[in-house]
Regions:
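Rhodanese-like catalytic fold shared by cysteine-dependent sulfurtransferases
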Residues: 1-24, 30-64, 73-111
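Short, surface-exposed ligand- or partner-binding patches at beta-edge/loop junctions that are enriched
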Residues: 67-69
């Protein structure tokens, strides 16, 4: 059975951050990618995709988690792992960093 991963749009996430409703943002990109472009730091965790299957249990099951990568594909995969392992409050950032750039912050570098 395939698990459906809930999504949150960049605009929705920005509104929540601005309102003080801050989920844990989980960056699953490679470390060098964060040096190129990054989202505002609000309780971020960084677990690169290559390490995710071994390290996901570092994430607090009680927290709301929003996963992101460059375009949303790797973070969708990672979010699915969490959901399949009993995490409940998990969302994938639609479009990833590129979606954030398109909807929220056009000054963020594209890569």
């Amino acid at each position: 059975m395939t698990v459906t991963v809930p999504v949150i749009t960049p605009t929705e996430l920005k509104a929540r951050l601005d309102a003080g409703n801050v989920p844990t943002l989980v960056d699953v990109r490679e470390l060098y990618e964060a040096d190129i472009a990054d989202l505002p730091e609000h309780g971020q965790a960084r677990i690169p995709t290559a390490e995710f299957a071994d390290r996901f249990e570092e994430l607090d099951r009680g927290q709301e988690l929003v996963l992101y990568c460059r375009s949303g594909r790797r973070s969708e995969w990672a979010a699915r792992i969490l959901l399949e392992n009993g995490y409940e409050r998990v969302f994938n950032l639609k479009g990833g960093v590129l979606g954030w750039r398109n909807e929220v912050d056009p000054d963020l570098p594209a890569y």
